[in-house]
Amino acid sequence: MNTLPVVSLTASSSFKFFHFPSLHRSLSHSPNFSFTKSLILNPNHLSFKSTLNSLSPSQSQLYEEEDDEEEEEEDEDDDDEAADEYDNISDEIRNSDDDDDDEETEFSVDLPTESARERVEFRWQRVEKLRSLVRDFGVEMIDIDELISIYDFRIDKFQRLAIEAFLRGSSVVVSAPTSSGKTLIAEAAAVSTVAKGRRLFYTTPLKALSNQKFREFRETFGDDNVGLLTGDSAINKDAQIVIMTTEILRNMLYQSVGMASSGTGLFHVDAIVLDEVHYLSDISRGTVWEEIVIYCPKEVQLICLSATVANPDELAGWIGEIHGKTELVTSTRRPVPLTWYFSTKHSLLPLLDEKGINVNRKLSLNYLQLSASEARFRDDDDGYRKRRSKKRGGDTSYNNLVNVTDYPLSKNEINKIRRSQVPQISDTLWHLQGKNMLPAIWFIFNRRGCDAAVQYVENFQLLDDCEKSEVELALKKFRVLYPDAVRESAEKGLLRGIAAHHAGCLPLWKSFIEELFQRGLVKVVFATETLAAGINMPARTAVISSLSKKAGNERIELGPNELYQMAGRAGRRGIDEKGYTVLVQTAFEGAEECCKLVFAGVKPLVSQFTASYGMVLNLVAGSKVTRKSSGTEAGKVLQAGRSLEEAKKLVEKSFGNYVSSNVTVAAKQELAEIDNKIEILSSEISDEAIDKKSRKLLSARDYKEITVLKEELREEKRKRAEQRRRMELERFLALKPLLKGMEEGNLPFICLEFKDSEGREQSVPAVYLGHIDSFQGSKLQKMMSLDESFALNLIEDELAADEPGKPNVKPSYYVALGSDNSWYLFTEKWVRTVYRTGFPNIALALGDALPREIMKNLLDKADMQWDKLAESELGSLWRLEGSLETWSWSLNVPVLSSLSDEDEVLHMSEEYDNAAQKYKEQRSKISRLKKKMSRSEGFREYKKILENANLTVEKMKRLKARSRRLINRLEQIEPSGWKDFMRISNVIHESRALDINTHLIFPLGETAAAIRGENELWLAMVLRNKALVDLKPPQLAGVCASLVSEGIKVRPWRDNNYIYEPSDTVVDMVNFLEDQRSSLIKLQEKHEVMIPCCLDVQFSGMVEAWASGLSWKEMMMECAMDEGDLARLLRRTIDLLAQIPKLPDIDPVLQRSAAAAADIMDRPPISELAG
């Protein structure tokens, strides 16, 4: 691994700019934050405020609507929420003193007097000048000073340090807050790369963001030097700078993993920018970012731009280990300081106190309780006043109330107070306008709430006459260009500076709103959280309507990362001196809950690496089968494929494996330290050590007396141990035939008992299946015969060796299914008792197998990953997690309290009773001997020695418990991704897409490897079906829509509206495909693969109608779908149709039909213009 310096801009460092800790150590961020108490202005009273208050609902009502969850899908391939940059707010708030000086303490922007267009042209001229210098004098002309000279302002230190690292040839990881200027680093790298005549790829997670970067880079570098590649756009793809989505780059890298081959799209590429690299934590798309880092040729420099995260050092360490020399640059300082506010019905106050470390006293729950108590005090009857007066010495003033809570408010009263403090939207907007805190992005977590909010406040006039005229003109131009994209219901609010922005709007309309907002012509945008996704739309204020949101039928709380992501929209660099984030009182959360989340801090990046059909096929496929041979072996075209071992090495390079390997190293180091400590402590309590201490502390006479008693006590304890062992063996001998005899007939319930790793007694009821010998030929028996850890030793019964009829014994293993849906493998040692009752071993239905056989077969299907729970000389106790199929059986195992003692069938022999009686007598003898010792002269000093020894024993127990937990953790760690990879490989093998042994790829596999989608194998199966050839283009579009409609919904509040029904041909085709889908699902379930196979005809009629030529107005007339949802479905369908002509081994007739359908459908207002 490359251990490289970590560059961290902090105030605590003794060196001004550099730290050099290990990459594995967490960085200590000490940002600068100057807390400024906001001046509270008296807003101008609005004449219509009382009317608005009567019309406007509380904000909490906007997100409490039933069945109104937000669909967070912006593009067909980019349909997950974006994880934007967020800053370490909690650290900033706690650090209210501005320690730094010089350049670090402020950001200086010297804005020239030219217009924005003139400045961009001037920068473009400077870029061309640098290119000319390099052509004339060589690449030595490129240095940090030349690069930063193209800018009209002084750049920040973290930007300089990152650019210098890039110029040294390192890959760079940059972690910094939102709007801090990370894009400038990528831009400088692009200038350097272009000047050398080489190429740079810039990747983003969203097509909308790619389009935005495309426009920005063309303004700086010129149209000829910048290209665009997304799922449905290819503009100037051979340009020196190419903007693309991450999936496009990943697909390029599949062609030649680890090589910058001239035969791939990476020819002449020197650098790749991974923007928004914190998407690596995205549960559905994070794998793509990891794949790019893993597959990228090592000679290509990576520039990874990330939001503020908790573990940037781990990210940089991982990239350094698998890709090469990597440097980390971090900054936690926001260029525009952020102040947190809290909105209630009657006020808008700073959320925090003046020190920035606690909630503002006037917002605390105690303050609200005090206010309510004062009101109750004034209103109560005279008797209550007298009681209060007597307790307080006759003084009933408010000052005395401050110091007492004799009658605290109940929970219901507190909730009532909270509800009374919930502001209406107009209340908060009125305060924002009065305090000059606009423009604002107002986050509401469902689209219906956003639209309703616009209507509730559309009587506010936030624009002056000049601004209103500009909006009218812009709206007029937009209507001429895109008449169908105008949102008529939003026009009134728009002319007053108010708009909504969410996934239910058309992309063209959203772009129009974004443009107006950037121009300052929209003052408030009510938006869902998708707007926090990296689009260049900063505001002065971000309002967050709630700390929780609906997900299905339940409410879920926002995480700190989500909060910071939205808060990061506040504060416009070069425009605002500070930004504001306003949190709002709701019926569910108050200021104190808000503070907890603000101080929670950001969470670390977590690997979401999972295998897919496309990954397996592209990594493993070798020679391929074709219909027409071209000279070699008939029907085959030879091509090198990777072995499973080679593929495994690639998969095991994931970020998750890197982090877990660090955990493994740290755990093994800690285990070694624990073993060393236990060894030292053991020596301190050995007989020799205690004897040595006794000689030192006791007199000769006392030492002799104590020693004699100790020897007697030791001998009696030895006898007690013998009796205990005799009891165990007698119990062992009683259990063995009992368990053996219960392997036929009904399945009895038993109780297993053991101590867990913390030393706590655990009892588990279970249903008994039988002795391990009854599992003849099973996977379990084979595993146990090969694994030495399951070996059992013969137990020599020395006490009974001379007695006739007392043979030597050996423990046996048995199997049971616990009530906790876990399999247990155990010996007689762990059985507490056996019960008469159990499962009747009778078939549940005619022809079914018996329950015992069913459960044995279920166990045989398991992965055999057993965990050891406890061990002894009489054998160990093992546990294996059950499956969904065993869960229903485990539900029938009763709890122990429902089983009576009378139901027990374990009865002990006379020999056991005799041994138990002798054991009891021996314990009494030991007790008497201890009392005798306690009365001896030297016992007081000796007791101190024993107490210290006992403390040491307890410490050793804790260390051993920690050791067991670490060992269990290490046993659970396995390479992430590989198990899924092999499961998917098995599905591919059985479906005849790829022979996993010979790496021979079949036509089905070729198609699946080339296609883009959630389940590539399923899409390939459908598109290769000959039945599709006879479909007309609109019908084919309808069938394709059924494959990509996941997540699209009708809106439940549109009861009287409708959607177009699909034609009978489309319905019949979808029904025909259902059998094929069911077969694939069964195959996936067999191999535990859980990748959805979408097939839903519900919206096919809408797509078929659009492909048949219906106008947008006809489509949307009384439509039960939001226009944004319909547009997204149509674009997904177009994307799939556009792939078909490029896929291998697809019928040419189908390819022509797909191309025709895509061409017909790609028309306004859903067509997307890139430039």
UniProtKB/Swiss-Prot annotation:
Residues 53-111 are annotated as: Disordered. GO terms for biological process: chloroplast rRNA processing; cytidine to uridine editing; embryo development ending in seed dormancy; Group II intron splicing; mRNA processing; plasmodesmata-mediated intercellular transport; post-transcriptional gene silencing; regulatory ncRNA-mediated gene silencing. It comes from the Eukaryota. A motif (DEVH box) lies at residues 275-278. Keywords: ATP-binding, Chloroplast, Helicase, Hydrolase, mRNA processing, mRNA splicing, Nucleotide-binding, Plastid, RNA-binding, RNA-mediated gene silencing, Transit peptide. It is found in: Plastid, Chloroplast; Cytoplasmic granule. Its EC number is 3.6.4.13. Residues 424-620 form the Helicase C-terminal domain. Disruption phenotype: Embryogenesis arrested at cotyledon stage. Altered size exclusion limit of PD; abnormally maintained dilated PD at the torpedo stage, and increased formation of secondary branched PD. Chlorosis. Altered plastid development. GO terms for cellular component: chloroplast; chloroplast stroma; cytoplasmic stress granule. Residues 163-327 form the Helicase ATP-binding domain. Residues 53-62 have a biased composition (Polar residues). Residues 1-58 form a transit peptide. One of its GO terms (molecular function) is ATP hydrolysis activity. ATP binds at A176, P177, T178, S179, S180, G181, K182, T183. Residues 63-90, 97-107 have a biased composition (Acidic residues). It catalyses: ATP + H2O = ADP + phosphate + H(+). Belongs to the DExH box helicase family. RNA helicase involved in group II intron splicing. Essential protein required during embryogenesis. Involved in post-transcriptional gene silencing. Modulates the determination of cell fate. Necessary for normal plasmodesmata (PD) development and aperture regulation. This is DExH-box ATP-dependent RNA helicase DExH15 chloroplastic. The gene is ISE2.
